[in-house]
């Protein structure tokens, strides 16, 4: 397996269920030369994104069904 040598951009918000998730997914769609991640500062680990975020992404033709919230600093 080859390591991903692309620069990493991490989007951070409080819960990693809305803002950072949306920013990461939209950035990943537009900036393929980077690896995008997201995290939160006060997180309930392992929760899916908010239903409003899922709906907003869908409105832009984007999805992220595997997203689970994670605490900043765990990667």
Question: Whereabouts are the PLM-identified features?
Answer:
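Short polar/charged helix/loop
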Residues: 1-75
């Amino acid at each position: 397996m080859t390591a991903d040598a692309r620069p990493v951009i991490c989007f951070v918000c409080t819960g990693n269920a809305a803002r950072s998730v949306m920013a990461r997914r939209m950035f990943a769609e537009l900036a393929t030369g980077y690896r995008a991640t997201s995290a939160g500062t006060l997180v309930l680990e392992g929760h899916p994104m908010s239903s409003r975020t899922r709906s907003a992404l869908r409105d832009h033709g984007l999805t992220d069904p595997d997203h689970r919230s994670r605490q900043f600093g765990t990667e």
